[in-house]
Amino acid sequence: MTSPVPRLIEQFERGLDAPICLTWELTYACNLACVHCLSSSGKRDPGELSTRQCKDIIDELERMQVFYVNIGGGEPTVRPDFWELVDYATAHHVGVKFSTNGVRITPEVATRLAATDYVDVQISLDGATAEVNDAIRGTGSFDMAVRALQNLAAAGFAGVKISVVITRRNVAQLDEFATLASRYGATLRITRLRPSGRGTDVWADLHPTADQQVQLYDWLVSKGERVLTGDSFFHLAPLGQSGALAGLNMCGAGRVVCLIDPVGDVYACPFAIHDHFLAGNVLSDGGFQNVWKNSSLFRELREPQSAGACGSCGHYDSCRGGCMAAKFFTGLPLDGPDPECVQGHSEPALARERHLPRPRADHSRGRRVSKPVPLTLSMRPPKRPCNESPV
């Protein structure tokens, strides 16, 4: 019997009538200043979509039969109409998964969430201890996230996720993350560090080493059966047998995934917020559905893609050349190997002088930190301690 998987992949590559995974950043306002923030969040954009405009988008998603939307930011819960929009979405058959640092997940909010259908909550943690996490996310952010997990567990909220960006500093804590998730009845989700947003400045110091990539792969194969990874780690697939890692081994940008930002701009990928990947705007280009179906960028991405320099590699069918955003923001050709290619094929290009594209906009608060990263820490310190007033 022929496996349906290749046919499904072919459909994904040609693009679907609606995205499977739609990320919507409701606001750039944030109470934290994480060093790797992919959207360089901090300050609210004055052109942020209004409540009415957001509801119009939700109406459109309902007509397109979008299953659910990933809501992020920034910190989405600081937007005054956040809960109104969540209620509106679920009432219009659009499920919501939102990512939060936990700042607004009080016992009362947790109780409300536990009584709500079609809402999924994801708490961001980048260290299994305060020492590791707070060096990335800011002083007090670990305790804040754990407090949110405690509140959700006490309220009986089922299915909370702990979302971890894997870095050089926390890859050794994988077992501890799993223990933490078990303690609060949570599912562990791990994602890849991308060199986008503020991550552009710290990627070289924070992305896992080659040995750590192998360590991560081995852990996922042996212990990661119930760990969510999405499409984060298909670049690791050549380390083992085909199919050993769960997840989608293709770039879904503009085919099955995309992003709407706070002002209504639509990008091909949540990790590629740059003019090069801007497909249109929901306000000025006839709505989201028109952008999704008719954008010239999305049409181009849905055409058969050349394997380029990776075509002669025997592992191409496993990794498909890796992550488009990771290549773009490290100044590598889009038809070449991933900067973290486990076969080492990107090393010659990384050794050469490259132009590193800058993010489209920086919403950070205060002056950017540009001094060299201390080698003893292998990272840039957070810009400021946790502050619950983001606006």
Curated annotation (Swiss-Prot):
InterPro entries membership: 4Fe4S-binding_SPASM_dom (IPR023885), Aldolase_TIM (IPR013785), Cmo-like_SPASM_containing (IPR034391), Elp3/MiaA/NifB-like_rSAM (IPR006638), MftC (IPR023913), PqqE-like (IPR017200), Radical_SAM_PqqE_MftC-like (IPR050377), rSAM (IPR007197)
Top-level taxon of origin: Bacteria
Reaction catalyzed: [mycofactocin precursor peptide]-C-terminal glycyl-L-valyl-L-tyrosine + S-adenosyl-L-methionine = [mycofactocin precursor peptide]-C-terminal glycyl-N-{[2-(4-hydroxyphenyl)ethenyl]-3-methylbutanamide} + 5'-deoxyadenosine + L-methionine + CO2; [mycofactocin precursor peptide]-C-terminal glycyl-N-{[2-(4-hydroxyphenyl)ethenyl]-3-methylbutanamide} + AH2 + S-adenosyl-L-methionine = [mycofactocin precursor peptide]-C-terminal glycyl-N-{5-[(4-hydroxyphenyl)methyl]-4,4-dimethyl-2-oxopyrrolidin-3-yl}acetamide + 5'-deoxyadenosine + L-methionine + A + H(+)
Chain intervals for the UniProt region annotation (Disordered): 340-391
Cofactor(s) the protein requires to work: [4Fe-4S] cluster
Keyword tRNA-binding carried by entry: no
Name of protein: Mycofactocin maturase MftC
Source species of the chain: Mycobacterium tuberculosis (strain ATCC 25618 / H37Rv)
Encoding gene per record: mftC
